[in-house]
Amino acid sequence: MTEELTPKQAAVLEFIKKSIRQRGYPPSVREIGQEVGLSSSSTVHGYLKKLEEKGYLRRDATKPRAIEVLDNPAGEKVEFINVPVLGRVAAGVPLLAVENREDIFPLPVHFTGSGEFFMLTVRGDSMIEAGILNGDMVVVRRQQDAGNGDIVVALLEEEATVKRLFKENGRIRLQPENRLMEPIYAAEVQILGKVIGLVRKIY
């Protein structure tokens, strides 16, 4: 049986539940502090530890945002996968995407579906008319092919870019979603994956 919570502990727990319910993933330590009026990250960690000790949360301290709510009134368990963040990708001029793991970001399985995934931070504004903005983190399912009109991360001459893919007349067109920018044409490109979603930080 879980122990009774103090008002501040209850506020922290409710904000975590709200974040998972609305966004599909837990809030950061800083977001929790801003929401409930805790200025110190160590204080937030203290509240999370207490909630874990009282049986309301399960955490993995080695991973950011890895918080599972155990007190779930709906009786539903939200399953997460840890998606590697692999650097940056251009949504403008092609930019080398460094295949090194910078971070881990947990996402709910109901958001990603099945498959192998990675995330990249977008730099540039060539996809703004598709709602992909500079600084967004795109969620990419690893696959070597995609259909016409899919938004993909493509490797072109060892540089990666995010564009809409079209196969036409024996060549590939990588189309930006910005009417001020020109498409990229190539005889062939390597598809690294299909963009299936994005995560955006609201300042």
UniProtKB/Swiss-Prot annotation:
Keywords: Autocatalytic cleavage, DNA damage, DNA repair, DNA replication, DNA-binding, Hydrolase, Repressor, SOS response, Transcription, Transcription regulation. Its EC number is 3.4.21.88. CDD domains: S24_LexA-like. It comes from the Bacteria. Coiled coil: none annotated. GO terms for biological process: DNA repair; DNA replication; negative regulation of DNA-templated transcription; proteolysis; SOS response. Homodimer. NCBIfam families: lexA (TIGR00498). PANTHER family: LEXA REPRESSOR, LEXA REPRESSOR-RELATED. This is LexA repressor. It comes from Pelotomaculum thermopropionicum (strain DSM 13744 / JCM 10971 / SI). The lineage of its organism: Bacteria, Bacillati, Bacillota, Clostridia, Eubacteriales.
